[in-house]
């Protein structure tokens, strides 16, 4: 098995920590109680710490959860987040209070997808994963501040554009997860058989699929909830007039 380039380890960790801090600041600004902001921060820290502790030595490629590889654990934070959004009134209010331009703008962190193309150029990642996932993330990351600015200035059709952008960004991540499963050395590998995706679920690259990707998916869901709710209220208001 080839070795992961050491020069990318520090940037991967720092980028992920920066994303965590920015997301926490966004939630802390929306929280009406300090205790709620602290709980959100603690949850993010525990999540990141778990990935950092478990990702070395190929833990997420093992089959102790057979027939589902340990990489199936990436769905746990998403399930927890969606469950809170569906059942917790306090969390629903927190999400509704988040400033949308910030929630969308923070997805500039998706530029981390450039690492996939860099690894492909070095022959360390299969094209079947690197191209669609890397290019998709870069496009979403570049357009994130643009969509955030359009929302900030409340330009015409800004909400529709933001909804469409969120859907595209969400679909890109879902496709990346599927391709990650299909190209990694697990029982579900059907692509890149001659060049398996060894690094994707190992340290430090595991920070992307096991922290950044699920967190970004949740941010898309939170944003869509608020934007669709606002669109529904606007339609009702226009109908009453």
Positions of PLM-derived features:
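Hydrophobic transmembrane alpha-helical segments in integral membrane proteins
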Residues: 1-20, 62-74, 204-206
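Early transmembrane hairpin module of multi-pass membrane proteins
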Residues: 9, 37-81, 88-91, 95
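Hydrophobic cores of alpha-helical transmembrane segments in multi-pass inner/ER membrane proteins
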Residues: 13-22, 73-88, 139-148, 207-225
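Juxtamembrane "helix-exit" motif on the non-cytosolic side of transmembrane helices
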Residues: 26-30, 52-62, 90, 116-125
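Membrane-interfacial loop-to-transmembrane alpha-helix junctions, especially the N-terminal start
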Residues: 31-44, 97-104, 158-162
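Membrane-proximal helix-loop-helix units in multi-pass membrane proteins
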Residues: 87-158
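Hydrophobic alpha-helical membrane-insertion segments
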Residues: 162-179
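Short, membrane-exposed interhelical loops at transmembrane-helix boundaries
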Residues: 186-207
